[in-house]
Amino acid sequence: MPFHGSRAEKGSPFSGYGFFAHGFSGFAEAMAQAVHDFRSIIDYLEFTGVDRIALTGMSLGGYTSALIASVDDRIQAVIPNVPVVTPDQTVDEWFPANKVVELRSRLSHTDSELTKAATLYSSPLNYQPLVPKDRRLIITGLGDRLAPPEQAEMLWEHWDRCAFHWFPGNHILHVSQPDYLRRMTRFMRDFMFD
């Protein structure tokens, strides 16, 4: 992902900082880059002979996997895990990112309605998924405060109430992770494995 790990900007206070440091237009640009990067990986995998690809991601990776499922028909299944689908609505609860966004908004006199409209460009809620309903599974934690369960529920509603798995836990502590990993395996068994 852009702005994460070795792709973080020098001096970033935390991994992923760059997603928020440049406002929501920067966020949209970073998401477009993430989609481009992943589609390049799909190209490479197909070139090497891979004929089936399922996609999962956690947190912003869940957002990204949901977005990619709306733009690339080569994906056989998608499983967003603790996805955030409206970061503009949840960023107020994300410390320290919320302080950066608050300062940027104050200094630039940013209109909240304009911000909401700007985030629609890269929102998976703005596009119909290309992955069939029976190949979509959303996983979320009941106690998640970084990606509140309401975020996953919004995606679930948008995706025609596809398969959904709740786990006890939060964004960091995935209690019963083996349960949802087994669910993922069962979910993909018929179309991903011979």
Language-model features, listed with the residues they occupy:
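Alpha/beta-hydrolase-fold serine-hydrolase catalytic core, especially in secreted/extracellular enzymes
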Residues: 186-194
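Catalytic histidine-centered segment of alpha/beta-hydrolase-like enzymes
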Residues: 169-181
